Amino acid sequence: MHALSTPTPPERLVEQPSTETVDLGIVEGYFGRPWSWAEREATMVFLAGAGYRFFLYAPKADVHLRRRWREPHPDAELSALRRFAESCHAHGVRFGVGLSPFEAWRDFGSETRQALASRLRELDALGLDLLALLFDDMRGDSPELAVRQAEMVGFAAAHTHATQVWMCPTYYADAP
């Protein structure tokens, strides 16, 4: 954005990016009131028109992506996610989900691996293009934390159909 001295009409606030150099998108990954499906759709459609090419669904309020990550989404929520993924694809936007496998790094044994693989199958069925494993906002008091998180990311990458796998570590700044 450029500093402007005169009011600018809203339609001129979004500059058209060069798709050759920038991969713009939105990460819906914040605390607070989540968007409604209508708000989410309107935002995605508007930003698709401005050259944004991915949408990562990861609201902190979606308990089935955080503390209750092992549980599948209820049918109504899963249907809404599926419709949104289809709409993203129809608008040329890659669809992704940010999963925060709460406390899974503490015991990444057979049971947890099976739960993660099962969850990834459910998410893949939505037409997942992007998968993000989000370890931010979690405890990080283990000397093996980075090793476990890397192990989980590798496992997820091997068990998803998503073409891109991203991660956000517990510590991503100088101070924990």
Range-by-range predicted roles:
Residues 1-23, 38:
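N-terminal carbohydrate-binding accessory modules
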Residues 24-176:
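Aromatic-lined carbohydrate-binding surfaces of glycoside hydrolases
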